[in-house]
């Protein structure tokens, strides 16, 4: 009986610590971005909702001058009775 009581007490403290870490620790997390409060528009009830937009330095062009080569996959000749394994892929 005493052993079960110890397990229950340990589990209660574990779940209490888990609940605290889930509820309290995100409050101490820093901001996700590096934007200052002055950069953020002040909103109120009468202001319309605006979508988040990217600034010009955030966009970077992707170079499209890559050389690509096409390769043909090697398919060996299949001869019935010699190197033929019926796998259903060719329909024979």
UniProtKB/Swiss-Prot annotation:
It comes from the Bacteria. Residues 41-55 have a biased composition (Polar residues). Residues 36-62 are annotated as: Disordered. It holds the Pfam family YjbT. Residues 1-29 form the signal peptide. InterPro entries: YjbT. Keywords: Signal. Belongs to the YjbT family. This is Uncharacterized protein YjbT. It comes from Escherichia coli O1:K1 / APEC.
């Amino acid at each position: 009986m005493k052993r079960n009581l110890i397990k229950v007490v340990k589990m209660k403290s574990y779940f209490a610590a888990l609940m605290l870490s889930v509820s309290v620790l995100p409050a101490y997390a820093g901001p996700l971005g590096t934007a200052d409060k002055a950069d953020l528009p002040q909103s109120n009830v009468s202001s319309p909702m605006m979508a988040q937009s990217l600034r010009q330095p955030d966009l970077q062009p992707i170079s499209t001058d890559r050389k690509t080569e096409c390769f043909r996959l090697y398919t060996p000749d299949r001869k019935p009775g010699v190197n033929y394994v019926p796998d259903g892929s060719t329909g024979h």
